[in-house]
Regions:
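Conserved P-loop NTPase
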Residues: 354-358, 365-396
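Short, surface-exposed linear segments at secondary-structure transitions and domain or protein termini
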Residues: 216-224, 378, 391-399
Length: 418
């Protein structure tokens, strides 16, 4: 199985049950690349002596022969076996995984990464935009021993069980939350669809016990509302496989409400599925190229739009320094065609494509395989998309809910409407 996807530039501190606090998840889908399996591991001597056969021609051999690699690994393992103080605690499987992970990371590419089985499962779950759980977002403040529910999805098992944003979770089934990290607590809450989980929460001075039946939850990646003067506001948190349908439904709803202009908010959107972002742009752009992708051999693929659904109303796209990858494909294309104005600050600057390959045993390799270019031929890698209207975010202590960047984007749209 191969997928081409986009990596995340930042970690999350608030996690739906399908999120990992320390992962850099990639997103997207492009076809046609090939990945070579670069390592095979065998375990000898009761699991204590590991021998690795490095294959793959010039990509793996370099100036060091296969025999040299094997001899050095044999020596390292012999030294561990002979002298290592904590020999009884050695996990042979973990050593194997460390070889694979280190091999990928030694490329020095921040977007190339090896995923073990557990990480790969979470990765694929995240990419699909669906997970099995109760439909709640959890957060844990730095140094805090408690876990707070910050969001409950509408009509989710959590909602039906009566959980509310602000509830403090202190026990999951028989597990005490105090002293545990957020990722561990999330893993307790998750589980197979149809199974029950008992949660104990504090709400004000009251302690409550609720039971929720886990179900398949679709991550809500699109939020929208109508602002004053019939200006629609549509926020996209990431480009998952479920995002296109949510985006299309949001556009239709805003149109039905009499929308005369639109703000699309991509701030803090780390990227996502390439098919998703190109499909979304086909609802906005005129006929032409959406994005071009060039591999190491110079082969180029153009993804195009037929222009049948071109958006002609005033449009502003909000971005910031954490708008990355697929978000930059979106904003770059809108900017190149003049479909709307880009408002905010220069984006992250990730203009490369990763391919995700199943290594056959449930583990995956994510490998950078191509660079992408906006419709005008711009590479934004390491550069980002510069806004048409630059606005730095300013926090207002007197009004924490104030958003000067959004206010400016609305002003831009309003001016175009006049």
């Amino acid at each position: 199985m191969e997928q081409n996807e986009y990596n995340r530039p930042e970690e999350e501190t608030s996690l739906p049950e399908n999120r990992k606090s320390d992962r850099k998840f990639l997103k997207g889908a492009v076809t046609g690349a090939t990945v070579v399996l670069i390592a095979v591991a065998c375990v000898f001597g009761g699991g204590k002596l590991l021998r690795y056969f490095i294959t793959g021609g010039s990509y793996a051999s370099g100036s060091v022969s296969e025999e040299d690699v094997n001899d050095k690994l044999d020596l390292i393992n012999a030294l561990i076996d002979r002298y290592y103080l904590y020999e009884d605690e050695v996990d042979a499987d973990a050593l194997v995984e460390g070889i694979y992970s280190g091999y990928a990371s030694a490329l020095g590419d921040p977007y190339t990464e090896y995923y073990d089985k557990e990480e790969a499962q979470a990765l694929l779950e995240n990419t699909n935009g669906e997970f099995s759980g109760i439909g709640a977002t959890l957060t844990q403040a730095s140094g805090d021993t408690g876990v707070t529910i910050v969001n409950v999805y509408k009509d989710s098992p959590a909602d039906k069980a009566g959980l509310k944003a602000g509830d403090i979770l202190y026990q999951v089934d028989d597990h005490e939350v105090a002293g545990e990290d957020l990722e561990t607590v999330v893993s307790w809450v998750k589980g197979e669809t149809g199974t029950e989980v008992t949660l104990k929460v504090r709400r004000g001075g009251e302690e409550l016990t609720v039971t929720a039946v886990r179900d398949t939850i679709e991550v809500q990646t699109v939020e929208y509302e109508m602002k004053e003067d019939n200006i629609g506001y549509l926020s996209v948190s990431e480009f998952d496989k479920v995002t296109y349908d949510q985006f299309s439904e949001a556009l239709d709803s805003l149109e039905e409400q009499g929308m005369e202009g639109l703000v699309i908010d991509l701030r803090n959107n780390p990227g996502g599925n390439l098919d998703t972002v190109t499909d979304m742009l086909r609802l906005l752009l005129p006929k032409g190229t959406i994005v071009s992708i060039k591999d190491k051999d110079g082969n180029t693929e153009e993804l195009t739009c037929d222009g049948e659904h071109e958006f002609t109303k005033p449009l502003a796209v909000l971005v910031n320094q954490y708008s990355a990858s697929a978000s930059e494909i979106f904003s770059g294309a809108v900017q190149d065609y003049g479909t709307g104005q880009i408002v905010g600050v220069t984006t992250y600057g990730k203009g490369v494509v990763q391919q995700l390959t199943d290594l056959g045993d449930g583990t995956y390799l994510k490998l950078t395989i191509a660079e992408y270019y906006t419709p005008s031929g711009r590479s934004i890698n390491g550069i980002g998309v510069e806004p048409d209207v630059e606005v730095e975010y300013k926090y207002d202590e007197n009004d924490p809910d104030a958003d000067n960047q959004l206010d400016r984007a609305i002003e831009v749209v309003r001016n175009e409407m006049e």
